[in-house]
């Protein structure tokens, strides 16, 4: 117990000290606070994008899902997340250009600059904030899991403590501090996750022995195949979900705006798929192997499988050290989410005449409390919370892509697209049985299938409304992708 306190306490203190050091050249203006002066080069952009995207969902959600589903979850996450580099590249360069053109730091600000529509800006910002709250709740939920595994106390204590810590250093240093702590926490998380995998595999007698044990049991043999888990439609839907949802994460969009150049975005997109495999392989293998030791965990309880396995094989000292990987992953995402979502509220939703410093700080604190409350009182699993947020994000993609690439998009088309797409997402969440007879019921593993009808509705709303208001003015949907340096 005492050694665990030393490890976690030392890590928390180190992050606060590092954040204070990292703010040494922080300016007071929004561009410095939210975009680090648009100075992120290729290597730093890659590290901060990866550390921000690989969150509690990566460590605990994917290990819990692989416990229930098996190794078929590995290509779903590793290939799917890596594949999103395509959309990051196609959209990222145009986002950066429009961001500079309009002085925009968020997607709704860019849409406002392109369409001149305050209604479109407010609609998009409101939905993005609402979508981020469930995803924000993943991080304190996972912090509670780590705290419980280390100290045996209730989950909510760990959730509260980590939320306080992250809010403290986010308010201290803005994006520059967040990016610099991302680099440290990303390296810590990746290194310790691989150490944890080596410990679990060694305890199981080697990877071949573990896989043989899984395949030889009637209760676990299904963990090595995709039968009953991922049909072709579910697999394709999940790939589409990652492709369109991830660039819409406010914290990832913010980093594309903060890139130093188009070449930096190209280098990041080129290397990102390799980093995705390195990040997802350890937790998914640990979750699958964990079924041998703990065969009867329920859906929410399976999110605990990674810390449980690590503590079993590593003991208090080494196990506690490896569990810091989970803390590093969730903290490197939570700080970015708070900062990016705070910029949505202060720059898109609040009155520009409000006192800037008070608004920035109070909004970040309020968002952290909302996420904390949802994490403590909701009984949804980490995977459930993540899929809900992803589905809401994906609907934004057509409007953002169209607004970035065309100068004459009507703001009413953006509003229609968002409302139509989100209506389908809401239907999938609250009335999945409505999809019976004409589509796949979006429940459990089939939740991602809702992305196809929701994107279709969003595209239809965008195109039909745009056609009605703008085609008489000679608008054309001609879409061009210009060549750019990748390396």
Regions inferred by a protein language model and the residue ranges of each:
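Membrane-embedded helix-loop-helix hairpins and adjacent transmembrane boundary segments
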Residues: 1-487
């Amino acid at each position: 117990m005492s050694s665990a306190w030393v490890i976690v306490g030392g890590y928390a203190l180190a992050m606060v000290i590092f954040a204070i050091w990292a703010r040494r050249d922080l300016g007071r203006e929004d561009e410095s606070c939210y975009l680090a002066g648009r100075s992120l080069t290729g290597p730093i952009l890659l590290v901060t994008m990866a550390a921000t995207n690989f969150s509690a969902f990566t460590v605990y959600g994917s290990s819990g899902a692989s416990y229930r589903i098996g190794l078929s979850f590995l290509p779903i996450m590793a290939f799917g997340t890596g594949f999103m580099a395509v959309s990051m590249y196609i959209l990222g360069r145009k986002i950066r250009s429009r961001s500079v053109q309009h002085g925009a730091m968020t997607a709704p600000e860019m849409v406002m600059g392109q369409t001149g529509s305050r209604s479109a800006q407010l609609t998009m910002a409101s939905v993005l904030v609402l979508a981020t709250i469930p995803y924000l709740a993943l991080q304190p939920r996972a912090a509670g899991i780590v705290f419980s595994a280390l100290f045996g106390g209730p989950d909510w204590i760990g959730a509260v403590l980590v939320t306080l810590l992250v809010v403290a250093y986010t308010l201290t240093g803005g994006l520059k501090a967040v990016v610099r702590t991302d680099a440290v926490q990303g390296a810590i998380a990746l290194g310790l996750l691989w150490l944890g995998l080596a410990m679990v595999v060694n305890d199981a007698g080697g990877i071949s022995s573990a896989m043989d044990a899984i395949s030889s049991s009637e209760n676990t043999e299904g963990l090595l195949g995709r039968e009953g888990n991922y049909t072709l439609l579910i697999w394709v839907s999940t790939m589409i979900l990652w492709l369109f949802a991830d660039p819409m994460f406010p914290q990832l969009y913010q980093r594309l705006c903060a890139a130093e150049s188009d070449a930096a975005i190209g280098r990041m997109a080129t290397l990102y798929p390799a980093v995705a495999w390195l990040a997802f392989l350890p937790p998914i293998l640990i979750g699958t192997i964990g079924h041998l030791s703990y065969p009867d965990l329920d859906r929410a309880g399976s999110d605990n499988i990674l810390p449980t396995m690590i503590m079993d094989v590593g003991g208090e000292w080494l196990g506690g050290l490896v569990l810091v990987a989970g803390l590093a992953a969730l903290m490197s995402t939570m700080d970015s989410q708070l900062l990016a979502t705070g910029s949505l509220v202060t720059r898109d939703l609040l009155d520009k005449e409000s006192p800037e410093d008070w608004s920035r700080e109070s909004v970040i604190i309020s968002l952290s409390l909302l996420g904390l409350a949802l994490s403590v009182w909701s009984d949804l699993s980490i995977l459930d919370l993540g899929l809900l947020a992803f589905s809401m994000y994906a609907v934004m993609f057509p409007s953002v892509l169209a607004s970035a690439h065309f100068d004459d998009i009507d703001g009413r088309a953006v509003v229609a697209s968002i409302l139509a797409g989100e209506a389908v997402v809401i239907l999938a969440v609250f009335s999945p049985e409505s999809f019976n007879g004409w589509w796949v019921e979006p429940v459990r593993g089939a939740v991602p299938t809702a992305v196809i009808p929701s994107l279709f509705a969003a595209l239809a709303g965008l195109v039909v409304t745009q056609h009605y208001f703008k085609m008489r003015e000679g608008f054309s949907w001609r879409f061009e992708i210009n060549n750019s340096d990748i390396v």
